[in-house]
Amino acid sequence: MSPTLKLALDLISRPSVTPEDAGCQDLMIERLKNIGFEIEYMPFGEVKNFYAKRGNSGPNLCFAGHTDVVPTGPEAEWKIPPFAPEIVDGVLYGRGAADMKGSLAAMVTAVENFVAKHPNHSGQISFLITSDEEGPFVDGTTRVVDALMERNEQVDWCIVGEPSSTKTLGDIIKNGRRGSFSGDLTVYGKQGHVAYPHLAENPIHLAAPALAEMASSHWDDGNDFFPPTSFQVSNIHSGTGATNVVPGKLNAQFNFRFSSELDFDALKVRVIEILDKHNLRYDIEWTYNGLPFLTRPGELVDAIVEAVQATVNITPELSTSGGTSDGRFIAKMGTQVVELGPINATIHQINECVDAESLNQLSEIYARILENLFAKK
C-alpha cells in the first residue's frame, strides 16, 4: 500500500466531526516536522488550527484544508463503518475519503517526496489546516488568516484540497467562487380568524408577491468567469398549526450566490426596494458569508494545468461554480487561490468514497505543481 493511502486510512479512522480534530492534525504535524517544517499552533475556541512553513524567502505556496468532517448519518446504512475505512475493489470508503482527508494525505506525501528530491528548494511551502470548515467557520481559517494578515505574512499562492473533480480526477479545478450572503426576513401581519379576513392581515399573502418578484428578478448577466447571480428561498415558516387561524407573522430565509458584477451593498439595496414597494412591515437580518474571488490564468493556474495534463492526460476546465469554501478567506490576503481535489460525487453522503488510485495520482499532481513553481526556475 502506498504512503498516501496509508496516511489517508489513518486520518479517516479518526472520528473528527466538526469541530473535533481527533488527532488528525497531530498526525500531519509529526510528518511535517520530520521534513523541516516549523509549526505554529493556532487554536481559537474549541477549534484546532495550525500553520506550518518550510523556507524563509521567495514565493509562498500554501496547501490549505480541513480535518473536520460532517456527521455520518445512520452508520448501519454504510457498507463499511465510516470511521473504519477499507479499500474494496479499488475504492476507498470512509467519512472524509473525498472531503477532504484524501487530499490532506496527498498533500503531505507530495511535499515529502518533493523535499526529499529538492532539500534546498527555492521558495516557501506552507500548510494552513483547520478543524472548523464544515461547521460555523468562525474560529477556523478566517481567524488564522486574520492573525497572519496582522503580522503581514505573505501567502502568494494557495491550493485548497476541496473535491473539485466531477467525473474524473482533475477534470475541473476551481479558480474562483461566487460570493454568498443570506437574509432572514420577518413579515408582520395581524392574527385573526380565517372566517373574518377583514379583521386580520395575512403575512403569507402579503409576503408572497415580494418573494415572487425577488425569485423572478434578473439580478445581473454574470461575466466571462461567473454565472449570473442567483436568488433562492431556502425556508418559509408561518402559522400556528391550526387551519382556522390567520398567522400573525411569516419568517422567510433566502440566499444569494452573486458574481463579481455585484456586491453585498448593491443587492441589499435592491431587496429593500422590493420589500418597501410592497408596503410590508418587516425586519430583516443579514448574514454575510464572503465576497466572490477569482484567480485568473497565470503562474499558479498554469502550473496546475500542466501538472494535471502531465499526470492524468486531461486538460482541466476552469470553473467558479458550486458553493463556498475557505478559499474565500484566504483570498482576502491577495492570494491566488485554486481548489483541486478528488471527485465530489459522494461527498457528505452515506458510503462516501473515492477511487484509491486517484489519491496516488493526486499526490503526484501536487508534487508536480511544486516542481513547476519551485524547481524549474
Swiss-Prot record:
Its EC number is 3.5.1.18. InterPro entries: Bact_exopeptidase_dim_dom, DapE_proteobac, Peptidase_M20, Peptidase_M20_dimer, Peptidase_M20A. Its cofactor is Zn(2+); Co(2+). Transmembrane segments: none annotated. Keywords: Amino-acid biosynthesis, Cobalt, Diaminopimelate biosynthesis, Hydrolase, Lysine biosynthesis, Metal-binding, Zinc. One of its GO terms (molecular function) is succinyl-diaminopimelate desuccinylase activity. PROSITE patterns: ARGE_DAPE_CPG2_2 (PS00759). The keyword Hydrolase applies. It is an enzyme of class 3 (hydrolase). Pathway: Amino-acid biosynthesis; L-lysine biosynthesis via DAP pathway; LL-2,6-diaminopimelate from (S)-tetrahydrodipicolinate (succinylase route): step 3/3. It holds the Pfam family M20_dimer. GO terms for biological process: diaminopimelate biosynthetic process; L-arginine biosynthetic process; lysine biosynthetic process via diaminopimelate. Zn(2+) 2 binds at residues 99, 134, 348. The active site is at residues 68, 133. Catalyzes the hydrolysis of N-succinyl-L,L-diaminopimelic acid (SDAP), forming succinate and LL-2,6-diaminopimelate (DAP), an intermediate involved in the bacterial biosynthesis of lysine and meso-diaminopimelic acid, an essential component of bacterial cell walls. Belongs to the peptidase M20A family. DapE subfamily. Homodimer. This is Succinyl-diaminopimelate desuccinylase. It comes from Marinomonas sp. (strain MWYL1).
